[in-house]
Design a protein with these regions (language model features):
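Extended, hydrophilic extramembrane loops/domains of integral membrane proteins
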Residues: 116-145
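Short, surface-exposed alpha-helical recognition segments that flank or form part
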Residues: 21, 145, 149
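Hydrophobic secretory-pathway targeting helix
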Residues: 1-9
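Hydrophobic alpha-helical transmembrane segments
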Residues: 97-121
Length: 170
């Protein structure tokens, strides 16, 4: 027969094979990245980033991610961490690490990690890794309790009302 071979399925299967081969390396980098962020204060992380130190140079270990050095995307992730860390407190545990093939062109996989922190027991990290093993995107997604959401809402209301009164007075 004159069948057409699907390049899309071949590409996905190739990504699956790559992930199977490098799964332990991806998991190791993910665990060490979260541990590094927790163990260091904002000044140290900022200093490392501004000196272009990748995680490998900081930890003295070899990683498959960001082998050619720190990227702007990793620095963006560090900035997100620095702005979120105060809401989380200290790291208590790292739970499930799930590595899934990313179907987007140029993206190898998406790594999701469940972590528990002192002030927030449900935090999800998401890392999108490119085909060349560079970090494309890193996100920190805390799940807030109803009480935490209400506290933020009250603070926003107070700030909003205060701003209106100040504008009206002057």
């Amino acid at each position: 027969s004159n069948g057409t071979i699907s390049t899309a399925s071949a590409k996905l299967e190739r990504k699956n094979m790559i992930i199977q081969v490098y799964q332990s390396y991806l998991t190791d980098w993910t665990t060490d990245m979260i541990t590094y962020l927790d163990a260091n204060d904002s000044d140290k992380i900022t200093s490392d980033a501004e000196s272009a130190y990748p995680l490998a140079l900081v930890n003295g270990k070899q990683y498959i991610i960001d082998q050619n050095g720190l990227t702007a995307k990793t620095i963006g992730f560090y900035n997100s961490w620095n702005s979120t860390r105060g809401e989380l407190g200290a790291l208590e545990s790292i739970g499930n690490i799930n590595i899934a093939v990313n179907k987007d062109t140029g993206k190898l996989c998406t790594i999701t990690v469940d972590a528990a922190y002192e002030k927030n027991s449900k935090v999800s990290f998401e890392f999108v890794i490119n085909d060349d093993f560079t970090l494309e995107n890193g996100a920190i997604n805390p799940t807030y309790t109803t009480g935490q959401k209400m506290t933020k809402a009250v603070m926003n209301t107070i700030i909003g009302m205060g701003t209106v009164f100040i504008v009206l007075i002057f």
